[in-house]
Structure formats: C-alpha cells, structure tokens
C-alpha cells in the first residue's frame, strides 16, 4: 500500500492556464478559492433551483429543489471534513499525511464537490435519465451489437449497424451505441464542468465529483474488486482522454476513486434521507405522527439506548413537549436532523480514518455509511420509509410519468436533426438555415449556443478523411441533443414541450 501523502492527491494545477512554480499555503488556498468562485457563479448551479429533488414542478418554496438540497449536502460535507481533520490532528497525523498545510483546500474541495454533485442531473431526476436512455435504446439497440447475427441488428441508424469485414469500426460502433444509451447525471456533471462550461477547475476539484469510475461504454461484468465503485457510469466516451489525464494527475489507478469523493457521497446520503421525509410532511403526504409510526414499525423492536431510541424516539418526545412554542413538525425535524447528524457524521469520519489506506489508494469498494452498523441501518430505515410511503405516492408517480413523457416527447420533436445525413447536417451547422430543411433549421436555431459550440469544436478536431469520422460526428450530434435537453430546468422542459406540441402558445 502506498504511503499516505495528500500532497500527491490535492493537485492544484489546471488543464489550461495552470499556475506554475512552487506555491505557499496561502497561494494554494487562493487557487481553490478561485474554484469556489467559478462553481458558485456558474449557470449550472443556478439552474438547480428549478430542478426536481423529489417533487417535480413544485411551487411551494419550502419544499427542496436540487439547489437547496445541494446546499445542505455542502454543509454536511464541511462538517464531516472538519471532523476528520480534527481527529487526525488529535492523532498527530496531519503532518504525517501531508495535510498540515492543506486543511483549507481539503475542506473546500469537499464543500464544492457537494455543491456540484447534482449539476448533471436532467429535468425530472431519475425518470428524466430513464427517458433519455430508453429513447436512445429503442433506436440503437446496443444489445444487438453483442451476440446477434448482423442481419438481426435492429439499430435504426444505418451508420452504426455492424458490418462484415469492418471489425475495428464495429468495435467503435459498439462503444458508441452503448455509451449513448447510458446517460447518467454524474457522467454529465463531468462533461458539464470540463467540456460544456469549460470551467477549468483544478484536477483535485474535478476528482471530487468523479463518483463512479465505470466508463459509460462498458460492456460485461465489472471487476469484483471495484463492483461498488463501478455500479453506474461515471464518464462518457467524449471525456475519455480527459479522465485518463485526470487519473494521471491525481495518481489514480484504473477504476479507482479520488479519496475526498467518499466524504461527498456520505454527506449526500445523510442529507437526502431526512430531507425527503421532511418534504413529504410539507406536501401533506403524511403527518409527523404518521411518519413516526412508519419509522417505528419499520425499525421493529428495540431497547432503550439503541440508535433508534437515541435519534428518532428522542426527537419525537422532545417535539411533543414543544417547549419552544414551535409547531410539532418543525420541532420534530429539527431534533431528528440534529440527532442524525450528531451520530452519523462522527461515524462517517471515523470510517474514513479507519479505512484511509484503501480510501487513499482509491480502492475502498464501499460507501462510508454502508456496512453492518446501526448507523447504516438508520439510513436504510429512512430510505425504506421514503420508498414505501413517498416515492410510491400517486401524486409523485403521476408527476414522474408526466416528466418521462415530456423528455421522451422533446427527444422525438428534435429527432429530425438526427435523421439528416452527415453532409446535410454539416451544411445546416455552417449556414444555420437551409431552405430545403425548414423544420430542421428551426429546431437547430433553438439549440443553445454553448452546446452548439461544443459540438463544432469536437467535430473540428476529428480527421475528416478518417473512416471513423461519420461515426464520431453522429456520436457528437447525439451528445448535442442530450446536452441540450438534460440542461433544461423542469419548468423550461415542461413549457417547451407544451409549446412545441401546440398545447399552448
């Protein structure tokens, strides 16, 4: 196991226009302050205020959006980071681990990773992801590229069908089809930060949001040693070279994770579990009393002094005494949140320290809060009650189905852009309006400028005389559409769908 030295991980250099020379502690901190400014002032963060957390198209400002959720995750991440640093200081290990002059950057990377952790999520959350993947899967059929005879390939894009005698090109076709059918919010976050917004963050800051290490074009089983780290796609084919460079800059082995990402993940797990239940009460899906009974029933028999007693029962009893003349709802969730944080944050911090050799190496194949402990059981309790009583509620499911239909419908509306030949689409990109393509011209005009520029830049770097060129061009054209639609807010996607379907002006 490599020696733990965080100076080798907290890399303050950037992909472009990187600071040069040796830097003092204060100068390094200023570099990460610059990262903070770039992130907080980015439009992707602002758009989170109109993206779904649990309840799509919610008008009640007391119910969480992706932005308010991310701010809460940021605070919990900061709490865990400070707890870790405090414990390492008590153990006199800060200097030994190369952290004595990097405590500020350590905290900042965690905080900003937490704030950014959802920026790649499409409108309508997981149902939006499913809509994008299902739409492309129905047209590309990546499974047919694996074992079917070539004559049975149902891919509707002629250029991406496998062909006899073209094995090198066929392998690229397989990758592209698989990649486009595995849109994922975390992978889109990497693409947003690097390719679409060109934020030019430090290598360490980007490492903090690389939550999953599986390429989106991965086929087959994942290695047992990395099955948790690779349980979802983490980056796309379009960012393959960038991620390879990131691994080099952060001293990460293949499919390994950046150490501080575990803290961001734990902060998210702690935050959303309580928040989803609180939002459900705000939405009147159930009362606080009903929630307490749901939690009590799901936990089962327990003794005094158990974690359930110290966290949930304690919050319930204090809220009923109502000594602060506040509503029982507010009191209960205040105590539940405080009790949960006071138990889970120190536990997560200690798990990080206890497993630091594997975490530093990037190979710890678990979440910090997924083990056989009572703390893990408490999180599972919150999640299970939310799944049973919140996510399955008819109002939530109806809105999710509407969101799925909106995203599928928008992809269908923009499909003519994918149906154009390479030469015709190239002409449209160059001229922006082609008389014989009136519908396609108008659809192209609606695409946002940053997304169009990202497409043009990617295609301009390809050798146009290569046999791979048509495949890559079509890949980036599909990415253009995914980028545009996934970047919409819930409300914009809803309104755009209604306008283009002529439901309203």
Curated annotation (Swiss-Prot):
The lineage of its organism: Bacteria, Pseudomonadati, Pseudomonadota, Gammaproteobacteria, Enterobacterales. dGTPase preferentially hydrolyzes dGTP over the other canonical NTPs. The gene is dgt. Gene3D superfamilies: Hypothetical protein af1432, putative deoxyguanosinetriphosphate triphosphohydrolase like domain. Belongs to the dGTPase family. Type 1 subfamily. One of its GO terms (biological process) is dGTP catabolic process. Pfam families: HD. GO terms for molecular function: dGTPase activity; magnesium ion binding. The keyword Membrane does not apply. Its EC number is 3.1.5.1. CDD domains: HDc (cd00077). InterPro entries: dGTP_triP_hydro_central_sf, dGTPase, dGTPase-like, dNTPase_1, HD/PDEase_dom, HD_domain. Homotetramer. Its cofactor is Mg(2+). This is Deoxyguanosinetriphosphate triphosphohydrolase. Keywords: Hydrolase, Magnesium.
